[in-house]
């Protein structure tokens, strides 16, 4: 039963990450269609960038602690990318450059979204597999 709880916790963390990334994409889309100004958009996105990175790091460590090596290895490139951005001070969006980098920022977040969705599908698969395996015992 502990294995099932591991996958449920992982599922909830991934849903939270998915929500944070979709929130960032919505803020960028609102800026693109001129519903909000650049300052508000940048402050909304910058507010959730660090929690996203911390949550992703926690998820990777969680997979390592629970012994799910494949899932931990799957999370390492995303974690490295977030760490790389943070160490070079490029993790936040600059208000003055947001219009110039709008397409690039959207592409980055769409890639992150696809990555999280892939990880989410694998987590759902392992959740179902673990549940059925516990049911047979």
Swiss-Prot record:
Classification via Pfam families: Cornichon
Top-level taxon of the source organism: Eukaryota
Entry protein name: Protein cornichon homolog 3
GO CC annotations, alphabetized: membrane
Membrane topology: Multi-pass membrane protein
PANTHER family according to UniProt: CORNICHON-RELATED
Transmembrane segments: 8-28, 54-74, 113-133
Location within or outside the cell: Membrane
InterPro entries, per the entry: Cornichon (IPR003377)
GO annotation terms (biological process): vesicle-mediated transport
């Amino acid at each position: 039963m502990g294995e099932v709880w591991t996958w449920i916790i992982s599922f909830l963390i991934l849903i939270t990450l998915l929500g944070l990334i979709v929130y960032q994409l919505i803020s960028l889309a609102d800026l693109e269609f001129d519903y909000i100004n650049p300052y508000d958009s940048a402050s909304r996105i910058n507010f959730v960038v660090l929690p996203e990175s911390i949550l992703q790091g926690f998820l990777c460590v969680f997979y390592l602690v629970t012994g799910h090596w494949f899932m931990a290895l799957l999370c390492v490139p995303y974690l490295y990318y977030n760490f790389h951005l943070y160490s070079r001070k490029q993790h936040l969006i600059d208000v003055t450059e947001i219009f110039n980098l709008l397409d690039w920022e959207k592409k980055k977040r769409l890639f992150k979204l696809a990555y999280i969705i892939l990880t989410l599908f694998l987590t759902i698969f392992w959740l179902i597999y673990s549940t059925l395996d516990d049911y047979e015992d």
